[in-house]
């Protein structure tokens, strides 16, 4: 897979596939037993499509399970998290839509890796 950026995180990794002024496209891999922080974004919404594995997604306190082929809409400022409770990695495609896509637009509410500022 060709990407323009790869970054390792405590929960797995992400690959930036495409980056434009009005959208950003990522492939995100969540390792078994890991989860992202419970977070929100002020300047972007996100659309996730699960392409591999099964995930547990929390949006505004509501928890739901998703599988390959499912799509999830995360509105701007909605608190959200994805987690992998299985033994195989979860892979999803994330489309970010908005006016700014910097990693500093992540406001963490809860984080297993002590990254709350």
Where are these regions (language model features)?
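Short beta-strand His + acidic residue motifs that chelate non-heme Fe in jelly-roll/DSBH
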Residues: 37-38, 57-58, 74, 80-87, ...
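A generic "binding-loop/recognition-motif" signal
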Residues: 32-34, 43-44, 62, 78-79, ...
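Double-stranded beta-helix
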Residues: 2-8, 81, 85-117
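A short glycine-rich, His/Asp/Glu-containing loop-to-beta-strand
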Residues: 3-40, 44
